[in-house]
């Protein structure tokens, strides 16, 4: 999918591709693939690769001591992504959630991102997203990423 999107990875980047099933063992439906280009004290850049209809489940990036939490911008590079954030509930959302997990999704304001579209989220904003039927690649640009501090709505998730 990365090649189709015109995104080339160096061998070391490809070797460090993270397959994140989030401890659920259901990667086909829930999880994502992550390429981290840089993650310093001040900035982070990643590619988030999602299979068709794959979900990155609801979570937020809370403050930690004197760090206000991660602010992030998502830019769609390939496919379509449905991003869900606080706001008025979308009447007919595109998301398809496994029935057994629906109670773990609380924000339903849909923002559709197509290639070239982007959306910025403030720290500690609950959000989740799902790829469209062809999968999706999203570039994430953010302040420092501390993935192990993410707070997921689903208590079964282990990061």
Q: What is each of the regions a protein language model found here?
A:
Residues 57-58, 66, 83-84, 111, ...:
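Short beta-strand His + acidic residue motifs that chelate non-heme Fe in jelly-roll/DSBH
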Residues 51-52, 69-91, 97:
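Glycine- and acidic-residue-biased ligand/ion/polar-headgroup-sensing regions
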Residues 40-59:
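Conserved double-stranded beta-helix
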Residues 1-46, 64, 99-103:
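A short, N-terminal "cap"/entry segment at the start of jelly-roll beta-barrel domains
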Residues 46-48, 65-76, 110-111, 119:
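His/acidic/aromatic-lined binding-pocket segments of jelly-roll/cupin-type domains
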Residues 42, 68, 105-107, 113, ...:
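Residues that act as N-cap/strand-start positions at coil-to-secondary-structure junctions
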């Amino acid at each position: 999918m990365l090649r189709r999107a015109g995104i080339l990875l160096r061998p070391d980047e490809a070797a460090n591709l993270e397959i994140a099933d989030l401890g659920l063992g259901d990667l086909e439906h829930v999880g994502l693939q992550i390429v981290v280009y840089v993650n310093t004290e001040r900035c982070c850049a990643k590619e988030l690769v999602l299979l068709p209809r794959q979900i990155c489940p609801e979570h937020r990036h809370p403050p930690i001591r004197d760090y206000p939490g991660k602010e992030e911008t998502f830019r769609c590079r390939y496919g379509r992504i449905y991003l869900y954030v606080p706001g008025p509930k979308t009447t007919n959302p595109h998301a398809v959630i496994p029935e057994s997990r629906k109670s773990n999704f609380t924000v339903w304001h849909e923002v559709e991102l197509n290639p070239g579209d982007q959306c910025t989220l403030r720290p500690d904003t609950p959000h989740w997203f799902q790829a469209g039927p062809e999968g999706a690649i999203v570039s994430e640009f953010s302040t420092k990423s501390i993935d192990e501090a993410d707070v997921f709505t689903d208590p079964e998730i282990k990061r």
